């Protein structure tokens, strides 16, 4: 567990680990380039034993939210944070998104940030804004996913998302007007374009 918010003007950057065998909490000492004090970010355990931290929001000195699109990596053996090199179409700054491991990639969907909903379909004119972005775990390259579904996912934030047997489930959240209990299921795959380069599709 990392970070958090006290509901007022303070965010946290401390880390806590729960031992499921002894049922005790510990606060490990970490080093390196740790994320700032924030909340609403995501943590994903990669196949190489590193924890990836993306996005989130912190409270600025004037009380104005500061949104992030940083990607940090924690080596769980050395407990050292780093900023891995990543390329491609970087996601816009956001929080309350979901980043879900799907095969050898991470699917980033939803969130709230500069301009509101992080989707051009919702009227956000922020350059490079996209609701669904995929990070290749091997090449560390971001790509905007192409939606082939005539009924695409309803944009939201504060939702939950999980992958089950190649299908991406999104439930709940806030759609900008009200809380929702909608459940969306989409199939995630890869298609090859003319140049042979694969692009993620949903």
Identify the residue ranges that each predicted region occupies.
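Kelch-like beta-propeller repeat domains
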Residues: 1-202
